[in-house]
Amino acid sequence: MRILKSHPLLKILNSYLIDSPQPSNISYLWNFGSLLGLCLGIQIVTGVTLAMHYTPSVLEAFNSVEHIMRDVNNGWLVRYLHSNTASAFFFLVYLHIGRGLYYGSYKSPRTLTWAIGTVILIVMMATAFLGYVLPYGQMSLWGATVITNLMSAIPWIGQDIVEFIWGGFSVNNATLNRFFALHFLLPFVLAALVIMHLIAMHDTVGSGNPLGISGNYDRLPFAPYFVFKDLVTIFIFFIVLSIFVFFMPNALGDSENYVMANPMQTPPAIVPEWYLLPFYAILRSIPNKLLGVIAMFAAILALMVMPITDLSKLRGVQFRPLSKVAFYVFVANFLILMQIGAKHVETPFIEFGQISTVLYFAHFFVIVPVVSLIENSLVELTTKK
């Protein structure tokens, strides 16, 4: 045991995973960190394995994926693990962010942790988009065309940027090559950001807790208590992931991507993966191209303003009934945006999308500050009595 505390590298591991003092009352909602680390590990291992058999060429990309599925030993398993763990990764990240919003994890002194977390989300979305293009099915090609074309909304230099990204005048061999290179690189950038995220949390005050108060009143070491607690959710995660991988591997994908990319034929609807749908819905809700692109990026960056706009004296919404209602309305609205992103651009959905988009931004910039001020006033009134 002594080497764990004296060895220059092992003592860092010891301070994070063995002796790290955690508040004794943290619930299972604090288990997402370990699950997300596991997801990233699975993605890197399966991704590197897939890269060994993949060919980033317009002519061979689709066939190389079929070769992985049919000819490589357990290639189908590696590919389905990679695609379904990507969905699990985003599902858990959204729950992790939801936990952070509910329990006020963005408030000082954890603002840096929250900011790095938001950057992690953006890098994840970029990585997922790049990866979706690689199988080079119909959705891959047209998704790449639509999303890269968003850059053309930038005044004056937009079209030049698009052609610079493509490496030509349309999505071609150069595009696929650079997307593959970047898709391979970004998970390692993500791993570095995750370490920064952990350092930012560990070197301030550590984890929060469901009461939103200081955790110093009662703490327990990470091992063995929280290691076993994390293992419970890790086993549940593997069971659920296995159900998807072995019984319904394509449930979360799009059948259009099993059609080889054809630049001469547009698919009936160009839809991204489910985890990017809310932001795609916000993009489509605004008729102006440039404003739509700005709104889509602002929707992600809006998370960054939470430490500023939440003016409440209490951490989290667990003891604030009005904020609790606002939080659940926000969650419902996010799920509605997810549905609308998958629909055709036609009459009821356009209006619903616009209302939901307004409500989404109103939550961050209007509802949260107003409701927190009302609750502060109510708290002051009751304490004066």
Swiss-Prot record:
Q: What is its main location?
A: mitochondrion
Report the co-factor binding details. Answer: Binds 2 heme b groups non-covalently.
Q: Which UniProt keywords apply?
A: Electron transport, Heme, Iron, Membrane, Metal-binding, Mitochondrion, Mitochondrion inner membrane, Respiratory chain, Transmembrane, Transmembrane helix, Transport, Ubiquinone
Cofactor section: heme b
Example of a GO MF term: metal ion binding
Q: What is the disulfide pattern of this chain?
A: none
- Residues bound to heme b b566 are 96, 197
SUPFAM superfamilies tied to this protein: a domain/subunit of cytochrome bc1 complex (Ubiquinol-cytochrome c reductase) (SSF81648), Transmembrane di-heme cytochromes (SSF81342)
Name the protein family.
Belongs to the cytochrome b family.
Describe its assembly: Fungal cytochrome b-c1 complex contains 10 subunits; 3 respiratory subunits, 2 core proteins and 5 low-molecular weight proteins. Cytochrome b-c1 complex is a homodimer.
Summarizing the function annotation, the protein's role is: Component of the ubiquinol-cytochrome c reductase complex (complex III or cytochrome b-c1 complex) that is part of the mitochondrial respiratory chain. The b-c1 complex mediates electron transfer from ubiquinol to cytochrome c. Contributes to the generation of a proton gradient across the mitochondrial membrane that is then used for ATP synthesis.
Spell out the note in the miscellaneous section. Heme 1 (or BL or b562) is low-potential and absorbs at about 562 nm, and heme 2 (or BH or b566) is high-potential and absorbs at about 566 nm.
Protein name stated in the entry: Cytochrome b
Originating species: Aspergillus terreus (strain NIH 2624 / FGSC A1156)
Q: What is the lineage of its organism?
A: Eukaryota, Fungi, Dikarya, Ascomycota, Pezizomycotina
